[in-house]
Design a protein with these regions (language model features):
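Peripheral, non-transmembrane regulatory/ligand-interaction domains of membrane transport proteins
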Residues: 1-167
């Protein structure tokens, strides 16, 4: 599925949902994305980074999005791709980070005109803000377990602390 919205000033935001696209070749043929960028977007283990392509002035951001559904004993993060071209911002998303697209859409709807970079950085802030409640909860849990360990050191409490450190 493709979402296309106007940012203003002739700029466009296009979101490509990888889970709903029928043919991945469309990313290259229709949207002009290079093979390397497509490979970044498809790689579940891609690390967060930024690339600048001097030839065409394209900037690619890979940013880690927190999966809000804790399926395991720990939280996972999944990469989301942002591509900034001359007059458009392309995001490549999936079901794990769809909540970000919804929040980006609400942000866009509440602002008349946005530059590509203002919208990009607002989007990155949306993603970063999702981490704060999780970090605060983990910090609170760590303090509780530390308090229990100070009262009485048990194997169970040591494992609980260990789980927090890896989670």
């Amino acid at each position: 599925m493709v979402l296309e919205k106007q940012l203003g000033n002739g700029c466009t935001w296009i979101d490509l949902d990888l889970d709903k696209l029928k043919k991945l070749e469309d990313l290259s043929e229709i949207y002009g994305l290079d093979k390397e960028t497509i490979e970044y977007a498809l790689d579940r283990n891609e690390r967060a980074h930024m690339d600048y392509h001097r030839g065409n002035g394209t900037v690619t951001f890979i940013y880690n999005v927190l999966n809000l559904k804790k399926d395991k004993e720990y939280y996972e993060a999944f990469p989301m791709t942002f591509i900034v071209e001359h007059r458009r911002l392309i995001t490549i998303s999936n079901t794990k980070n769809a909540y970000v697209i919804e929040q980006m859409t609400r942000y866009l709807d509440s602002h008349d005109t946005l530059s590509i970079y203002k919208f990009l950085f607002a989007s990155l802030e949306i993603i970063s803000n999702a981490y704060y409640p999780v970090i605060e909860q983990m910090d609170k849990s760590k303090d509780e377990v530390n308090g229990l360990l100070r009262q009485r050191t048990t194997k169970k409490n040591l494992f609980a602390l260990s789980d927090l450190e890896t989670g």
